[in-house]
Design a protein with these regions (language model features):
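Peripheral, non-transmembrane regulatory/ligand-interaction domains of membrane transport proteins
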Residues: 1-150
């Protein structure tokens, strides 16, 4: 799923990409990946790195592109292992912000709703990256409290 998000009073979805907007891609199809490479020249190596479920958090530069990989929490339906982490990549240059996650998570939709509720004005890519890191930490703590509640006494 591909979303074009523009920050007004929080992030709102638009029908097409606008300069300084955020392209969020969740569970990308081959067409989504090709779109990112063709339309925005996103490095293919970045997209394949994010696809690796064992990818570790890091930053990497390639030309004028910056790749930031985070590990974000994911709730599983498997009762033996109720929680896991998956990589999300935030790919930026001077004109675009792209996030790619190969898994459906609660983090990004919740983050978008939060920016709308608080009418946040996120001014640049660095602020967005830091706010996504913070949101990830909030979800880790939320899931940690669920683990604590469900522990047998």
């Amino acid at each position: 799923m591909r979303q074009f998000l523009y920050c007004e009073a929080g992030y709102v979805e638009k029908n097409q990409w606008l300069p300084n907007s955020w392209v969020n891609v969740e569970c990308p199809t081959p067409e989504d990946l090709q779109f990112l490479m063709d339309r925005f020249n996103v490095p293919e190596s970045f997209l394949s790195d994010i696809a690796d479920t064992d990818e570790r958090p890091r930053i990497e530069y390639e030309g004028n592109w910056l790749l930031t990989i985070l590990r974000i929490p994911l709730q599983n339906q498997d009762h033996d292992i109720p929680f896991n982490t998956v990589p999300i990549g935030i790919i930026t240059n001077n004109e675009i912000i792209v996030s790619v996650c190969y898994h459906k998570t609660d983090l990004i939709p919740d983050f978008i709703r939060y920016t709308q509720r608080k009418e946040l004005q996120i001014k640049n890519k660095y602020e967005l990256i830091l706010r996504l890191i913070h949101s990830s930490a909030v979800w880790f703590l939320k899931y940690l409290s669920l683990i604590h509640i469900s522990e047998p006494t």
